[in-house]
Amino acid sequence: MRVSDFDFELPAERIALRPAIPRDAARLMTVAAGGAIGDLRVSDLPSLLRAGDTLVFNDTRVIPARLAGERDRNGLKLSVKATLLKRLSVSRWTALMKPGKRLRVGDKVHFTPAPLRGGAEGSRIGGEVGRRSGATPNGLPAPPSGADALAATVEAKSEDGQITLAFDLSGPALDDAIAMVGAMPLPPYIAALRPEDDQDRQDYQTVYAREDGSVAAPTAGLHFTPSLLAALEAKGIGRAFVTLHVGAGTFLPVKVEAVADHNMHAETGEISSQTADALNAIRAAGGRIVCVGTTALRLLETATDEAGVVHPFAGDTAIFITPGYRFRAADVLMTNFHLPKSTLLMLVSAFAGVETTRTAYRHAVDGGYRFYSYGDAGLWFRRDAS
């Protein structure tokens, strides 16, 4: 297949710059296994699932991965920006930096706090309103401002432009410093239209996030509220949590012409033995596995064998799901509306069928659905599922 097979026209006004309020007021397009389309709200989700089904959530937490500061080389200062990509150890991260070509191995970089801009009260990371002012996510005092707020040394530079930073802090102390110094890494299609502000620290985080490590949100989960979770539980719909730390590669364009030639980026994830056992029991009892987001689906498919048995998993996955893939674990997928020619649109096309997906996306565009991270969602029933 050609990448151009997954192209479509999207008017700029369809790109959502803010989420629905409340979160579960977002529109929800349902796409049945046979292709029938319905128009509802996310708050209607309990009526669309059955007792015994289980929602699989990605509990990763977005970190404020955008850092700004100065390189100091023998008194020669240079303003720099960094986007953290992947944690390598308790004190080391890979990052994309500007201007990366002017940085050398051994350079010292001092990062300073990002200015606060409007928005709601509460956490800089979001999702836990009410932390005391000046405190980190762990309730610790904020690191000092100025040149000593957070420092790192350029440890290595790779041919693909990534830079390895060795920070002066490690473990929870480093996490706390990043939380106070960094800014939320809004997707490029939003950042190009407006600046990040304090409201994003809540909006760009799921209410159940708990494992720090992502530089992009698992956006399908942004629609869930405590009241919606309670309504699902009251109907007998279960929940399970997996962790996949979403990397900046999720926004990278596909630059090849043939789908088969694309080199998929890797992301780090984990499924516990308890979660694997629970999902296998749900499937054995006739319940459906409902993946909340493509990240949960990709991790679950990585950890599931040909017989449909989910196994514990810890490591990297670079699974690239395209039409023709045989799904092993997921029965239903809830996901936002994705970019043209993206790997995520290819995944949805594999799940629901290429023509069904094209028809549904035309319906979404014509019907005024809001697209991308802060936009509306679709509930897709696998094309070969009963």
Regions found by a protein language model. Give the residues of each.
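Intrinsic disorder/low-complexity segments
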Residues: 113-148
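Surface-exposed, charge/polar-rich loops and edge strands
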Residues: 1-113, 138, 147-386
